[in-house]
Amino acid sequence: MLRSYLHLGRHRTPAFRQPLGRLLRPTASILQYAQSRTLASVSSLESLPEVGDQLHGFTVQEKKQVPELHLTAIRLRHDKTHADYLHIAREDKNNVFGIGFKTNPPDATGVPHILEHTTLCGSEKYPIRDPFFKMLPRSLSNFMNAFTSSDHTMYPFATTNQQDFQNLLSVYLDATMHPLLKEEDFRQEGWRLGPEDPRAIQTQEGNLKPEDILFKGVVYNEMKGQMSDANYLYWIRFQESIFPAINNSGGDPQHITDLTHKQLVEFSKKNYNPSNAKIITYGDMPLADHLKQVGGVLNDFSKGAVDTTVKLPIELRGPINVTVPGPIDTFVSEDRQFKTSTSWYMGDITDTVETFSAGILSSLLLDGYGSPMYKALIESGLGSSFTPNTGLDTSGKIPIFSIGVTGVSEEQAPRVKEEIQRVLQETLQRGFNDEKVQGFLHQLELALRHKTANFGLGVIQKTFTSWFNGSDPMKELAWNEVINAFKSRYEKGGYLEALMQKYLINDNCLTFTMVGTPSFNKELDDKEMARKEKKFEQLTQQHGSVEKAVTELAKAELQLLEVQEKAQHADLSCLPSLRVEDISRQKEHKPVRESKVEGTDIVWREAPTNGLTYFQAVNAFADLPDDLRLLLPLFNDAIMRLGTPTRTMEQWEDLIKLKTGGVSTSNFHTTSPTEMGKYTEGLQFSGFALDKNVPDMLEILTALVTETDFTSPSAPAMIQELLRLTTNGALDAVAGTGHRYALNAAAAGLSRSFWAQEQTSGLAQLQATANLLRDAETSPERLAELIEKLRLIQSFAISKTSGLRVRLVCEPASSTQNESVLQRWVTGLPKVPSPTSQPQRFDLSTPSKKAFYDLPYKVYYSGLALPTVPFTHSSSATLSVLSQLLTHNYLHPEIREKGGAYGAGASNGPVKGLFAFTSYRDPNPANTLKVFKNSGVFARDRAWSDREINEAKLGIFQGLDAPVSVDEEGSRYFLNGITHEMDQRWREQVLDVTAKDVNEVAQTFLVDGTRRSVCLLGEKKDWAESEGWEVRKLSMNPNGSNIPSGDAA
């Protein structure tokens, strides 16, 4: 995969994302550039300045029109500071800004990462504490963030509102150019020593002991959590081995505690200046306005130091082997705890054509079940899944191509490199099938047509990555020039094979192996304790006694607490803000029409799609038996893996690439907008293609669903392979979105609807998959029973029953043709009803449920769920306002700023009827749960100001009015039955919410509500069992879990 770079940043409260995809690996990661409606005047050459023109202190250096992307790029330089500036003019209302700085990390203390956090904690023009988070509810931005990469840091935002753009631009520029970088912000965001709960200091009356002191800090805890992700750990240790010149920019907890505030300030002075910056703006807003505002800030600076150093990886002049220890994966057999990969260099990213070609080569070798590397390394059983570094990494100047697998035994580990080299040699001799190459080129054609809402953000991210490593951004944007150059070389014959010969057919490579070690986590704990004792010993010597050292730490903690509490009542009038009055009361209407084809309901959304048709079908199953529900995700995997009697999966993958932009199947679960507890579940099928290829797309989908051969001799082995793919790395998947898993597990205790969803997409599904794998590997009879159940699902998966519904998005001119195609498709479907079972009674007798998942993480993830009301209820909108108010005015300051968690927040799921509290990478879950518990009284008793109410409403409309990709239009009505009128009414209710309304719903649902369920994920401590938690485990061990997987009661 063309892996970008690792993003570590100040995110909003982590969003509740969809379950991690059960995909083999990302498909060819070629940046998906989308077309706009027409080549509008905003991106025409005539409306923009010419080379040599001077505007607001900038001089135009270069100008280029890119017709295939419907944009014009202008490169400028600031006359006084020589700051680089790139403007991308395009008819796109979602405008984007980004400023980046070269920040080569001098060590592994995480100074670029901690600087990224503290930079946004206050500036000269906006001297309040943390203007970044304070701006979140004062803006209609659909994206605000900051990212630390391996060698640069960037600060992007996106918004459709011009005043909002100017407001955010002012805040971002002042933050990056004039940061305050106060020591208390460094202590809060970076690291410090202090008592776990600062508020308990006063009550302990001098009884604070050295053992009560621990390392704290937002970034420190973030990186402890990051290091608990074995995939990240493998990737970063690999980077440290092949790229020692680039230190760990995120920070290693073992070294973060060596960083001082003085070093942070010096690093900022050295790197955060206009001469060392690169700036990008994108969209349809006037360039002159941007230059005037940006130039007004940059003109205060003189030309400064520029870090032009481009770090390079180690030289590979022969084989190098590196082996490091890592954590045990409890979802993998004890005798398969090795992860190993081999890496080569592939040229220079400044050669855009060769780098693009290397990406195609990587995809041909790795993408899909039919790829040669998948067959040799995973299908063979040698390993379970690809390593995190597998693919082409173009984040540095030298592209690095890696291939590796996890879940390998110690005896087989040396064979991995041998197999990789064997496959490379055989592929070189055999050459590449032209049909496969044409398939990838067809995918590029569709990517150019596909209209996405976040095109600008994608351009900025990719441009910064290569620009900071010496690539020409104008060449990067010239998409057709690159593709045409590739085609020209490819058509001469032997080009890709020559590329392989040049870079991969040699032994100039690094083999990196991580070995699962039982003592790994304990050794980390011991090292942290030793570091703490050393720091404490230094403090004791400094202050003369242990007691004085403890007293001084407590005093410093109370001082920080005082600063944090004062900030909660600070005057924010210096910050710019939009007004609620600026928001239209009318929701933009994107009408759909409905029809019936052969008795099947069809929802049509006719819109400009650049000649593409997007297809989505759902088949709903009523009262599906619990044992079959658990198998729906595996069924979806299987039909995209096993092949049919007429074609292997490799042949199907080639056809999919040649005829479509992709097809997929997945399980779906939606709740009623009008009735609590009512839900619909089943399977959904989707894909998109050129209008002329819609018949082929539907034929492919239908064949895969109905004809997949579960009886072939290879089917049992492939089923086990799929189970291993899912279980391998399951703990890392949970660590990445632990708050979401915790919330889903908590909600499962509230209703059968949430329980059913947990069975297919939560921790229960992960454990069920591990159980299936264990049974499949130990009992041929159990495996045969499993396959029979999958065949049963296949018989009714897609059928002409009352549960089948279809949505199409296409051009109006394509509707008639598509209707004829649909008619033929529906007519040819079988008519098989799904089996049913009597739903078990859901136990509502327990008002509060507590589940604790004992997992090997160094921080915690929590979720607390409360049932509320349907979407159409009058309290739904008020609950959403309440969630915003609690997040920004209570949970963020209490749990993140004071408690040190990376993220915390409240959310209202208006369609699900669920109010939720979550924390993410949290060192102090006991305190967090107390804060959750006190939230109701806090919200009920607070006299909410008009400003706070209005900011909460703005926060809701950030998501409500965010741009939507064309393929998503109409899906809300199609899946959930939410009409435009329902959305309009809910919108008006949000705008009309009062402070009194908020107080009342807080009383009703948070204070008086008796039904709630909570879940914690993390390392079990003694208090878990003493406080009434039901302790559970996730494991391959048959006795390692007591998760109820098939019992709704």
From Swiss-Prot:
Which residues does the annotated transit peptide occupy? 1-39
Subcellular compartments: Mitochondrion intermembrane space; Mitochondrion matrix
Provide the primary localization: mitochondrion
Q: Write the record's keywords in alphabetical order, separated by commas.
A: Hydrolase, Metal-binding, Metalloprotease, Mitochondrion, Protease, Transit peptide, Zinc
Q: Which domain of life is it from?
A: Eukaryota
Entry's Gene Ontology BP terms:
cellular response to farnesol; mitochondrial protein processing; protein processing; proteolysis involved in protein catabolic process
Disulfide pattern: none
Positions annotated to bind Zn(2+): 113, 117, 222
Query: What Gene Ontology cellular-component terms does the record carry?
Result: mitochondrial intermembrane space; mitochondrial matrix
Q: Which GO terms describe its molecular function?
A: ATP-dependent peptidase activity; metalloendopeptidase activity; zinc ion binding
Cofactor(s), by name: Zn(2+)
Q: Which InterPro entries match?
A: Metalloenz_LuxS/M16, Pept_M16_N, Peptidase_M16_C, Peptidase_M16C_assoc, PreP_C
Top enzyme class of this protein?
A: hydrolase
List the active site: 116 (proton acceptor), 189
Task: State how the cofactor is bound.
Answer: Binds 1 zinc ion per subunit.
- EC number(s) per UniProt? 3.4.24.-
Task: Tell me which family the UniProt entry assigns to this protein.
Answer: Belongs to the peptidase M16 family. PreP subfamily.
PANTHER family attached here?
A: PRESEQUENCE PROTEASE, PRESEQUENCE PROTEASE, MITOCHONDRIAL
Protein's job: Degrades mitochondrial transit peptides after their cleavage in the intermembrane space or in the matrix, and presequence peptides; clearance of these peptides is required to keep the presequence processing machinery running. Preferentially cleaves the N-terminal side of paired basic amino acid residues. Also degrades other unstructured peptides. May function as an ATP-dependent peptidase as opposed to a metalloendopeptidase.
What do we know about how this protein assembles, alone or with others?
Monomer and homodimer; homodimerization is induced by binding of the substrate.
Protein name in the entry: Presequence protease, mitochondrial
Q: What is the lineage of its organism?
A: Eukaryota, Fungi, Dikarya, Ascomycota, Pezizomycotina
